[in-house]
């Protein structure tokens, strides 16, 4: 049941709005006056059709068939056939969060009034999201130009009573899914099928879901990095604000400040401030602000690109009702999304890479000064030995997944669409990387708290003790070997819930995507 609401003023969604939509399901309604604007635009399209002017996708074929003129009597069939023929995706269906966001983003773009669709189309998109009619959209089949055609065709198929949708956990034919919640299919008018299919909403939604999940994993990795620093009895000297001010990198400065806040009153840190023969810590401890700060800056840049795209008109042709014009362009080309997703992939992979190195340090008795593999009676017990191997496997997998997708292109539609972005895959695989890094950070979380337990009675800082206590409420100390996977899953769930839930006292100082 909906417990909150969002009024959609087209083109004005904020990162906070999008984050909220990614993690919850507010009821969305159009702002006042938007339906009148859409109705005026639809009447303009009718005038263009009546004038008999050839307009791509309105009274012509599509792609390589753009020069084929379509008779007025066939214009509605043209739009329906477009949807059916383009619903050619394959693979597992996208998750509910992504599909709900696709519906909202498509409504947001169409509602700006430059696509020539009737208000009924936008109303139905929003009501499908509000009432939980979520089209079954296969993950694979889009090259990110001309828009996300196949995914959006599967979305649109449900609007016209075809395709399939999930409703209350059941998969139903499109018309039955709509009627199950009191909605009815629509018949598409001129331009409407093309407007629904053309656009970057699928790749943008995939990227946004991955981005907001990455934000939570990033914040958790800051906490686990501080836990590891204390468990390994590292020095806080490299976090001195003077060092970071001299470099001037914004993300680095913010991350260093958070590490200082997390470790401020640690008795462990104070215990080895004097008479410690170690001059410098390994890079995975010492260079955390530099690495994590660069990742933060990269994620923020990606967020700024995706925010623009979430509010964009990425249709083609684009309609200008005030002059009854249709202009063919290339706003459907998802290159901005693809490059932003590639940057996210690199940044999130690096968060996992340095976390895995910190974990490797903890299990190495010579590096950490802790029991081998963080368990008593090592030899009889293997402790964290294979958990670290799992983290290494995930980090190595990410190296391949982080290869840029945007630098690849294959021509389609008989070379009419001869350069494509690969944005949909670029965005989808970021989700895979985020999932891998969440597990790496979860294993580090387990290891760091285990390491801190060995340092008792010395206590870590209050914030870090809170993080350790939250884990220990679900996962007991490793006094002997046991099956590890359930513990990793428990730590992963804590991370997925978000650090503000884990440590409400530091929520205000956590770096976020907003600059």
UniProtKB/Swiss-Prot annotation:
The modification 2,3-didehydroalanine (Ser) is found at residue 146. Contains an active site 4-methylidene-imidazol-5-one (MIO), which is formed autocatalytically by cyclization and dehydration of residues Ala-Ser-Gly. Keywords: Cytoplasm, Histidine metabolism, Lyase. Pathway: Amino-acid degradation; L-histidine degradation into L-glutamate; N-formimidoyl-L-glutamate from L-histidine: step 1/3. One of its GO terms (cellular component) is cytoplasm. It catalyses: L-histidine = trans-urocanate + NH4(+). There is a cross-link at residues 145-147 (5-imidazolinone (Ala-Gly)). It holds the Pfam family Lyase_aromatic. GO terms for molecular function: histidine ammonia-lyase activity. It is an enzyme of class 4 (lyase). It is found in: Cytoplasm. Its EC number is 4.3.1.3. PROSITE patterns: PAL_HISTIDASE. NCBIfam families: hutH, PRK09367.1. Belongs to the PAL/histidase family. This is Histidine ammonia-lyase. It comes from Gluconacetobacter diazotrophicus (strain ATCC 49037 / DSM 5601 / CCUG 37298 / CIP 103539 / LMG 7603 / PAl5). The gene is hutH.
């Amino acid at each position: 049941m909906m417990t909150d609401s969002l009024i959609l003023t087209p083109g004005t969604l904020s990162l906070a709005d999008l984050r909220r939509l990614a993690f919850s399901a507010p009821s969305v309604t159009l702002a006042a006056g938007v339906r009148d604007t859409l109705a005026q635009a639809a009447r303009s399209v009718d005038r263009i059709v009546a004038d008999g002017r050839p307009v791509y996708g309105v009274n012509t074929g599509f792609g390589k068939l753009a020069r084929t003129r379509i008779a007025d009597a066939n214009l509605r069939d043209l739009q329906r056939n477009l949807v059916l023929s383009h619903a050619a995706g394959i693979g597992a269906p996208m998750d509910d969060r992504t599909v709900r966001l696709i519906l909202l983003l498509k409504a947001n773009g169409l509602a700006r009034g430059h696509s020539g669709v009737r208000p009924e189309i936008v109303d139905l998109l929003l009501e499908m999201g509000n009432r939980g009619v979520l089209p079954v959209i296969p993950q694979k089949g889009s090259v990110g130009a001309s828009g996300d055609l196949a995914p959006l065709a599967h979305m649109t198929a449900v609007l016209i009573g075809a395709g399939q949708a999930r409703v209350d956990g059941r998969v139903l034919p499109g018309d039955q899914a709509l009627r199950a919640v009191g909605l009815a299919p629509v018949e598409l008018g001129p331009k409407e099928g093309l407007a629904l299919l053309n656009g970057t909403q699928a790749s943008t939604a995939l990227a946004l879901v991955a981005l907001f999940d990455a934000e939570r994993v990033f914040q958790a990795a800051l906490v686990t990095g501080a836990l590891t620093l204390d468990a390994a009895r590292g020095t806080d000297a490299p976090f001195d604000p003077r060092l970071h001010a001299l470099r001037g990198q914004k993300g680095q400065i913010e991350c260093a400040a958070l590490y200082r806040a997390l470790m401020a009153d640690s008795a462990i840190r104070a215990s080895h401030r004097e008479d410690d023969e170690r001059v410098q810590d390994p890079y995975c401890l010492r260079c955390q602000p530099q690495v994590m700060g660069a990742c933060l800056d990269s994620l923020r840049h990606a967020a700024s690109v995706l925010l623009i795209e979430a509010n964009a008109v990425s249709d083609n042709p684009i309609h200008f009702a005030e002059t009854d014009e249709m202009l063919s362009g290339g706003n459907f080309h998802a290159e901005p999304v693809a490059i932003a997703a590639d940057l996210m992939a690199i940044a999130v992979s690096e968060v996992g890479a340095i976390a895995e190195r910190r974990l490797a340090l903890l299990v190495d008795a010579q590096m950490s000064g802790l029991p081998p593999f963080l368990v008593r009676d090592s030899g009889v017990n293997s402790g964290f030995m294979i958990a670290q191997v799992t983290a290494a496997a995930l980090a190595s997998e990410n190296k391949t997944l982080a290869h840029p997708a945007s630098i690849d292109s294959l021509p389609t539609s008989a070379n009419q669409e001869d350069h494509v972005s690969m944005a949909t895959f670029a965005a989808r695989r970021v989700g895979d990387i985020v999932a891998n890094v969440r597990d790496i950070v979860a294993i580090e979380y387990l290891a760091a708290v285990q390491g801190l337990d060995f340092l008792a009675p010395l206590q870590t800082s209050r914030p870090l003790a809170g993080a350790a206590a939250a884990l220990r409420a679900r996962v007991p100390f490793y006094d002997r070997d046991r099956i590890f996977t359930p513990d990793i899953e428990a730590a992963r769930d804590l991370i997925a819930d978000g650090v503000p839930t884990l440590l409400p006292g530091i929520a205000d100082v956590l770096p976020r995507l907003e600059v």
